[in-house]
Amino acid sequence: MDNFPDRLLELAIQIQQIPAPTLAEGPRGDFVRGRFIEEGLKEVSMDSLGNVYGCLPGKNKKTSPLIISAHLDTVFPEKTNLAVNKESDKVSAPGIGDNSIGVAALFGILWLLRERGIELTGDVWFVADVCEEGLGDLRGMKAVVDHFGANVLAYLVVEGLALGHIYHRAIGVRRYRVTAHTAGGHSWSDYGQPSAVHEIAALVTQLAAIPLPRTPRTTLNVGVMTGGTSVNTLAAEASFDLDLRSEDLSVLAGLAKTAEELISTAAKPEVHFDVEVIGQRPAGEMSAHHPLVKLAETCLHEQGLDVTFTSGSTDANVPLSRGMPALVLGVTTGGGAHTTHEYIDTAPIEQGMGQLLMFVESCFR
């Protein structure tokens, strides 16, 4: 299949050109569903959340299936300029690496299996899932794992920009939306009364000063702040979104407790805070010595690639947190993830697809 990389890139760009912000992946899901049908996959369906499923039957129905997933959604709003810039060694476009090339790789695996006449022992389920990013809270993958359960060979999660990495540890994440309420007023005549904007700014400063351990790696971030009415108004309402992460669940729980206590003590008679949990990503881990992790390592080495064992917050969090075998492998390298300057390197795609094909074929041996 001499033009395989070009075909894969062409499909990735077709996918990338369909806006798919989290919670609005429908049109992209419809496109993938149509392509699954065109490719002749069996039992093609879309569930109530928008996850798309298609089965490549194996020779033995008694063999547990392999689930290969790639998330449909992107971090970019619907009206984002999705223009593509092609260069000799890379393709730049919002969402091309995270995760359009990952979704395209589902088809790439299928094409390579057929081109090389590889018939697998068990079924392979290709899944394009929703709600991986941000406030999606992994609800798509939670539904996928609920659907298939533990009677699987493994969950293989494909991420476009992760080539060379094996994600076998899932970090825990807690997310909050904190809203301050005050009486508000005029910036001159009511000066001295609390402003909700000032209150959240002071609180964020306190949160950012919480000491965090380097090991286990632990982070705190306020990614969004909103509120206020005008430049000369004491804001009656303002809010911020808080993201807490750690490789260790007990450390995460301690950080969450500290943050919640700071929020509680920031309240005053004239200032009320509402706290809403907007995301909880479960943690889990598969040993670096697990046979599937060792297999993934071998597959990368066969492509002449160095291996980095990695922790992260991905769709693999869900099965790993439930004690099921799962890991993340990548398609290529690149950079600028979650920015409009996102890009993928084109040369490593063949190596990336080579390791994915070897992993899928070897899983059933």
Q: How should each PLM-predicted stretch be described?
A:
Residues 2-92:
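Acidic/His- and Gly-rich active-site-bordering loop/insert found
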Residues 26, 95-171, 212-213, 243, ...:
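Acidic/histidine-rich catalytic neighborhood of metal-dependent amide-processing enzymes
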Residues 32, 105-113, 141-144, 200-204, ...:
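Buried hydrophobic packing segments
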Residues 72-86, 152, 168-179, 327-328:
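Acidic-glycine-rich active-site phosphate/pyrophosphate-binding loop
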Residues 82-93, 181-184, 301-303, 334-338:
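Glycine/charged-rich beta-loop-alpha catalytic/anionic-binding loops adjacent to active sites
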Residues 106, 158-183, 187-190, 196-203:
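Phosphate/diphosphate-binding glycine-rich loops and adjacent basic-rich segments that engage nucleotide
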Residues 188, 195-365:
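Metal-dependent amide/peptide-bond hydrolase catalytic core
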